[in-house]
Regions:
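Glycine-rich nucleophile elbow surrounding the catalytic serine of serine-hydrolase chemistry
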Residues: 118, 192-204
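Short, well-ordered amphipathic alpha-helical segments that serve as non-catalytic structural scaffolds
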Residues: 171-176, 242
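Alpha/beta-hydrolase fold nucleophile elbow
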Residues: 184-196, 215
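Mature extracellular/periplasmic domains of secretome proteins
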Residues: 205-209, 230-237
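Active-site nucleophile loop of the alpha/beta-hydrolase fold
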Residues: 214-225, 244-250, 273
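Short, solvent-exposed loop/turn segments at the edges of secondary structure
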Residues: 237-240, 261-263
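Catalytic His-Asp charge-relay segment
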Residues: 240-244, 267
Length: 444
């Protein structure tokens, strides 16, 4: 058995541009202009990006009832802003139509490349989180960090923004293909981090790129994507490794904004993916501590945004590592019955930037669901302890009823736990298992 990081044991004892019908091959881009109808479906073709249609897998009467064409490319106006350690504050704008914009920039194929993609009604109002994430990444390593700004296409109505995500994904794929053609970029060195609709954009980009390295879906948007075919939503085939963080997984009918569906190679559900600790407090305090705009963001979607917080703090966290564990369900996890990484380490993984260490254990045909607990304030990480209590059964013994307490001492401190909040029956010869967590680092 491997000892998992961060947990301790205590024992008391791409879309096609060609339509094939019969034996006839029709090039949609040549034969159909924008917004024309083809067999009852509307189609829009965009130079270099291909054709986008309504209907088919993109329509569902319940899950995707309004299906429209994307806006024009000029309206969505995708911008690629490059940051490096050489220029951490001043962006270089990269353009897929301008080779010199790349050649004259600090972009290097000798560095891994990180894309950051925002979601709905984001960036122009709520951009600071992306630049903060960029700063953390550059502190961590020597990366090319590209912030993708598609704020021209992410406004109301929501269904129009969802349609525009397909174009944004195609734009990212086009830039990567240009970088591959112009300077020899290896797509396997590219990692797209997308939040909300940005997660779905990452999937659209990945399906067009041969061997995209990694996608991190940060609470991928539920409305218009949950329960839809893989052509419509993110799925494990979109990159060589897809990891997902779920923090707002209630149904949209209960005001949840993120997917509950498992859509990656590994899907993390911190705090069961719902009701994140600290959010009720954050919704009010954020107006004071973070300003009006970020306060609005937290008030409307604290659970949804919490996935960004978790990823952000995972980048340079060393003292405490957020580890998720495979478990039957959340209740079983809370009972302390899932603390085994397995002999090969395949039953646990680090949530966040270092999740790629799970890649050797991935199964392209199966999503692995993992649970962990977090605190309600930064850096959010908790140390998890599995406590196993086994009672002997001497010849003269009787069962007892009461509370069980634990005092845990380490080189750097001591923490007291109440293992049984309610009166509990204790039977001689029985074994009891608990999960306790703390944000205190008590071991050297």
């Amino acid at each position: 058995m491997l000892k998992p990081p961060g947990l301790h044991f205590i024992s008391l004892l791409v879309f096609s541009t060609i339509w094939i019908q019969g034996f006839a091959v029709v090039d949609l881009h040549k034969h159909y202009q924008n917004n024309e109808t083809f067999q009852g479906e509307k189609i829009k073709c965009i130079d270099e990006l291909g054709c986008f249609g309504t209907g088919g897998v993109f329509f569902h009467p319940l899950f995707r009832p309004i299906d429209v064409l994307p806006d024009d490319r000029e309206v969505i106006n995708v911008q690629f802003n490059l940051y490096t350690r050489d220029r951490p504050k001043d962006e270089r704008v990269l353009k897929s139509s301008d080779k010199n914009s790349v050649l004259k920039s600090e972009f290097s194929i000798n560095r891994p490349t990180k894309f950051i993609v925002h979601g709905y009604i984001d960036n122009d109002l709520f951009g600071p989180w992306m630049k903060s994430l960029k700063d953390e990444l550059l502190l961590r390593g020597d990366f090319n960090v590209i912030i993708v700004d598609w704020s021209g296409g992410n406004k109301l109505p929501y269904y129009q923004a969802t349609a525009n995500t397909r174009v944004v994904g195609a734009e990212i794929a086009l830039l990567i293909s240009r970088l591959e053609e112009w300077i020899g970029l290896n797509p396997e060195d590219c990692h797209i981090v997308g939040h909300s609709l940005g997660s779905q954009i990452s999937g659209y980009a990945g399906e067009r790129i041969n061997r995209l390295g990694r996608i991190t879906a940060v609470d991928p948007a539920e409305p218009y994507f949950q329960n839809m075919p893989v052509e419509v939503r993110i799925d494990p085939s979109d990159a060589l490794f897809v990891d997902v963080i779920h923090t707002d997984a209630k149904t949209i009918f209960l005001m949840g904004l993120g997917m509950s569906q498992e859509v990656g190679h590994v899907d993390f559900f911190p705090n069961d993916g719902t009701n994140q600790p600290g959010c009720k407090k954050d919704q009010i305090l954020s107006f004071i501590t973070d300003g009006l705009l970020e306060g609005i963001r937290r008030f409307v979607g604290c659970n949804h945004q919490r996935a960004v917080d978790f990823f952000h703090h995972s980048i340079n966290s060393h003292r405490c590592v957020p580890v998720g564990y495979v478990c039957q369900d959340w209740e079983t996890f809370l009972q302390g019955r899932c603390a085994d990484c397995g002999v090969d380490g395949s039953r646990c993984a680090i949530m966040g930037l270092r999740a790629e260490k799970f890649k050797p254990h991935k199964d392209d045909g199966k999503s692995v669901k993992m649970y962990l607990k977090t605190s309600g304030s930064s850096p959010f990480c908790l140390f998890h302890y599995q406590v196993i209590v086994k009672l002997f059964k001497p010849s003269k013994s009787r069962d007892e009823r009461g509370h069980l307490y634990l005092s845990l001492k380490g080189d750097e401190g001591e923490v007291d736990f109440t293992l049984s909040n309610d009166l509990e029956e204790f039977y001689h010869g029985a074994q009891y298992t608990y999960l306790v967590t703390t944000d205190k680092h008590i071991e050297g």
